[in-house]
A protein has these predicted regions:
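Short, flexible, glycine/charge-rich loop motifs used to bind or transfer phosphoryl groups or to couple energy/partner
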Residues: 1-2, 59, 112-114
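Short, small-residue-biased leader/transition segments that mark boundaries at the very start
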Residues: 1, 5-12
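Conserved non-cysteine loop/helix-boundary elements of the Radical SAM core domain that shape
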Residues: 10-67, 76-93
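Terminal RNA-binding accessory module
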Residues: 73, 84-181
Length: 181
């Protein structure tokens, strides 16, 4: 998990960020080659963030295709260096940028989840829903922050805490549906 904010290709000394866009993309490529799930958090509206920098961030998010992305708008904390920085971004601009980022990420999540349709995955059963359904999570979904997998179990509903194989059958931007094998 890596927290980001909009950044040009130079290093950002404002947040003591160690790395450039190219450094992050190299890490992303390595993680993808190993089949890892990529997640990050993004601060929108950090002081001094320009529209051009924000568009560069959107391009970066589109190129990177994080599996999971959380975002929040910057809010000044008393006593921090950023709270005293010039060029504070207006709330309305921060909210607009946040909405644009989340809309983009929703499309990315849907695209990445659709790519999982037909795959067989091991999931941890987290709850039973009755009528032959249960909820679960694979190694790609973090508890309390990511979507869930709704599983049709048939006549045998496994108990929470068991790992079961499923085939992903449907995908939404955040949640998946599957069939127990």
């Amino acid at each position: 998990h890596r927290e980001l904010h909009s950044f040009p290709t130079r290093r950002s000394s404002d947040l003591r960020f160690r790395g450039t866009r190219e450094d992050i993309l190299r890490c992303v490529r390595g993680a993808r080659e190993r089949g890892l799930t990529l997640r990050t958090s993004i601060i929108v509206g950090f002081p001094g963030e320009t529209e051009d920098q924000f568009r560069e961030l959107l391009d970066f998010v589109e190129e990177t295709e994080f599996d999971r992305l959380g975002a929040f708008t910057y809010s000044p904390e008393e006593g921090t260096p950023a709270a005293k920085m010039p060029d504070q971004v207006p709330e309305k601009v921060k909210e607009d940028r946040f909405s644009r980022l989340m809309l983009l990420q929703q499309k990315i999540c849907l695209r990445r989840n659709k790519a999982r349709i037909g795959s067989v995955e091991q999931v941890l059963v987290t709850a039973t829903e009755g009528d032959g359904f249960c909820l679960g999570r694979s190694s790609r979904e973090a508890p309390e922050t990511d979507g869930e997998i709704y599983i049709h179990c048939g006549k045998t509903t496994p108990e929470p805490g068991l790992f079961i194989p499923i085939r992903i059958s449907e995908a939404g931007p955040y949640d998946l549906k599957g069939e127990m094998l």
